[in-house]
């Protein structure tokens, strides 16, 4: 059970006052970084700005308290924007809350069932494809506010967005665009000045001051969303129906997989920064609890945020106390300073997310894979990317995983091979080769199987043939790591064929997994235990005795 025990309980032994001070300072700095991102991501997701802070506070607390990483910072991330926007557009806020809670439950189950290590089986091509797809979708989704387009709403579909922008291109607000460009410029230049204060916060303060004091005609959070709620989030159980639960299962599963991938990736990155090892299953449970309570308190899906976690480490955070401090700081900001957030220009928040989208897309890896990866990997990469952009993340991940699995099985089936040994007097054997070969009678045929024998390659077993003078067939299996039920079916068919011809099947060097499957299947008893040998020499000696 130690692997499910929250990391907080482990690191508090010998906790010093000096580290407490460092954790508090790191938590406050991370809260300042998280503030503009949480608000911007909530708005981009189609919900109110307060819900972004609710998520960072509630989910962030549970992720830090119950998670398996010392330094993980949880909250809303750009990866969820696309899927949240689609859920809200189709099913409303109740649908989003149900999906968030279901995703949390799935994550908790994944953690309890020790699925933490299974996330590594999600192919790199899929994560690269959907990450770049999310970046493109997120980038395009900000153009309305960045240019100040006079549109009542933005369609959820990618192509519909482009068409809608084209129809309203004449409504561009030049002032809003200039303010947005100023915000982008500040975020690009500020890191060269100092990395202690995030450029996004500086951009928000500067552009908000310009718009407010110059009384510019630019949409702000207050003009779009009205007065902001500065009270602590209230516990709320949504109206749940079985139909809504069924509708939300698929997006909830996608949210859970995304949260697991991003949080564990963040945990691995932070491990390298602090020289620690996270508990992946405890982390999944912490992520699950964070999402369950985020939904119940009106928040949106959350996960570990790589950038905020890295900032926590760089500023001295070394225990979950830093993450909890980040939540407390955001709570104080929510209760005291939230009315000031109404003054923030919408174009500035759009600019923040444009920069986030540009930074999250790993185009270098994307194009490198397109140039150098095997054709099957390129197919998965490109398919996942375009499905994310033109359909949605749910479809992209589901089809991407299935496609990757099918192409992987095809590749494995192509590597599986069965070769017949040659006789020393074969016409195509050179004298040098003949010296290396064992001289065996023509009444014995030897076949060597290479590669895993599973359903995609099982039919190759039936390629093992015999001549009219064959009395024994030796099958060497030292290069077969695994077999499945389909391969066993083919072996049974081969055995029946051999019996009809009075041919003895002899097996050599059967590895542990194939031997276990054969034993469980009853195949060893059927063929005869005496026909299984540890090595090819013993198998050939036995075969020669039989055919004398």
What role is predicted for each listed range?
Residues 328, 514-515, 534:
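Short secondary-structure capping/turn micro-motifs that flank functional sites
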Residues 1-426, 490:
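Transmembrane helical cores of multi-pass ion-transport proteins
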Residues 526-542:
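Short acidic-hydrophobic, aromatic-tinged amphipathic segments that line or gate anion-handling sites
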Residues 73, 507, 532:
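Conserved SAM-binding loop
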Residues 359-526, 544-548:
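The feature marks cytosolic C-terminal regulatory regions of anion transporters and related permeases
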């Amino acid at each position: 059970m130690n692997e499910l025990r929250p990391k907080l309980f482990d690191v508090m032994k010998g906790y010093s006052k000096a580290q407490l001070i460092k954790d508090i300072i790191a938590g406050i700095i991370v809260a300042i970084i998280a503030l503009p991102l949480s608000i911007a991501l909530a708005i981009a997701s189609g919900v109110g700005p307060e819900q972004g802070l609710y998520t960072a506070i509630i989910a962030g607390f549970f992720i830090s308290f119950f998670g398996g990483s010392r330094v993980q910072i949880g909250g809303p991330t750009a990866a969820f924007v696309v899927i949240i926007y689609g859920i809200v557009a189709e099913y409303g806020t109740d649908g989003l809350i149900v999906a968030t809670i279901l995703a949390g439950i799935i994550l908790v189950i994944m953690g309890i069932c020790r699925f933490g290590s299974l996330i590594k089986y999600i192919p790199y091509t899929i994560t690269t494809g959907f990450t770049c797809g999310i970046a493109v979708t997120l980038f395009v989704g900000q153009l309305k506010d960045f240019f100040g387009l006079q549109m009542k709403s933005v369609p959820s579909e990618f192509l519909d967005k482009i068409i809608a922008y084209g129809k309203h291109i004449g409504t561009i607000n030049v002032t809003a665009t200039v303010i947005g460009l100023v915000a982008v410029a500040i975020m690009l230049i500020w890191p060269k000045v100092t990395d202690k204060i995030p450029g996004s916060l500086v951009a928000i303060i500067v552009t908000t001051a310009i718009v407010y004091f110059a009384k510019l005609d630019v949409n702000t959070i207050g003009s779009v969303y009205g007065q902001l709620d500065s009270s602590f989030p209230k516990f709320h159980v949504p109206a749940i129906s079985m139909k809504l639960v069924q509708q939300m299962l698929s997006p909830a599963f996608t949210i859970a997989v995304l949260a697991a991938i991003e949080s564990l990736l963040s945990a691995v990155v932070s491990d390298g920064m602090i020289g620690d090892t996270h508990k992946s299953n405890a982390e999944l449970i912490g992520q699950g609890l964070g999402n369950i309570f985020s939904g119940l308190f009106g928040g949106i899906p959350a996960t570990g945020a790589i950038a905020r976690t890295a900032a926590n480490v760089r500023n001295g955070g070394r225990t979950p106390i830093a993450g909890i401090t980040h939540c407390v700081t955001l709570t104080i900001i929510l209760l005291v300073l939230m009315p000031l957030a109404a003054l923030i220009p919408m174009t500035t928040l759009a600019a923040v997310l444009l920069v986030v989208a540009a930074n999250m897309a790993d185009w270098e890896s994307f194009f490198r894979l397109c140039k150098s990866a095997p054709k099957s990997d390129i197919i998965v990469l490109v398919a996942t990317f375009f499905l994310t952009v033109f359909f949605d993340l749910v479809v992209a991940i589901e089809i991407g995983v299935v496609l990757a699995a099918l192409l992987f099985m095809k590749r494995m089936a192509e590597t599986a091979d069965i070769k017949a040994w040659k006789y020393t007097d074969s016409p195509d054997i050179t004298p040098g080769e003949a010296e290396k070969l064992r001289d065996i009678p023509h009444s014995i045929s030897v076949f060597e199987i290479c590669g895993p024998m599973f359903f995609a390659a099982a039919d190759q077993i039936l390629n093992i043939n015999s001549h009219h003078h064959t009395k024994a067939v030796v099958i060497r299996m030292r290069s077969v790591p695994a077999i499945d039920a389909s391969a066993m079916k083919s072996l049974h068919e081969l055995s029946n064929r051999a019996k009809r011809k009075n041919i003895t099947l002899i097996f050599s060097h059967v590895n542990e997994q194939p031997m276990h499957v054969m034993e469980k299947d009853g195949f060893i008893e059927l063929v005869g235990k005496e026909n299984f040998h540890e090595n090819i020499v013993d198998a050939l000696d036995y075969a020669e005795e039989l055919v004398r």
